[in-house]
């Protein structure tokens, strides 16, 4: 039986996800109708990867001790990157309770999984098929998901959009760039391809105060220059005399 702390936390995360516009073209996630500890996600294959156009359904199974203990992460849809329905080893899964942080959430976990997915790092539950195979599986992913009654029951809106638009994405035909791992600590964990968003480069600006300081420094040097010139003139006079 789930604890009140766990249930309250997961309800807050569900509300936060529903209001998060930044992830609407990256993934969708919601709990099972009958069990709030069993969440289902769908990752939209990131652009510029072999997964682009894919539609990857999986589960996050939370322990009753959540958020103090990490969940199990699985992927059901064949991707060429993970073993289907097998627990995936990441720094934010139950394989590594020592690296888990209670501050991480569903959103953090899924973004971290996407980051790990776009790399070729090995681990328990991971495989690395050829790019051609992964592209082929991406094109077949919707057909596979439509045979899954759990997917069909939980994500009717995605199926409806797919049939109407002929696209895998719920809000637009062109998904936004995937967002950075800062979220993942391999993390947050991984530093990877998730975050290919434009990051402003810090620039150094000259303020009026800086300009005034430079002028003052320049003015302070003038007497020394005049004195130096005067000494040269005196020395020349004595030498020529």
UniProtKB/Swiss-Prot annotation:
The active site is at residue 89. One of its GO terms (cellular component) is endoplasmic reticulum. Residues 1-219 are cytoplasmic. It catalyses: S-ubiquitinyl-[E1 ubiquitin-activating enzyme]-L-cysteine + [E2 ubiquitin-conjugating enzyme]-L-cysteine = [E1 ubiquitin-activating enzyme]-L-cysteine + S-ubiquitinyl-[E2 ubiquitin-conjugating enzyme]-L-cysteine. It comes from Dictyostelium discoideum. CDD domains: UBCc_UBE2J. It is a single-pass type IV membrane protein. It comes from the Eukaryota. Residues 170-215 are annotated as: Disordered. This is Ubiquitin-conjugating enzyme E2 J2.
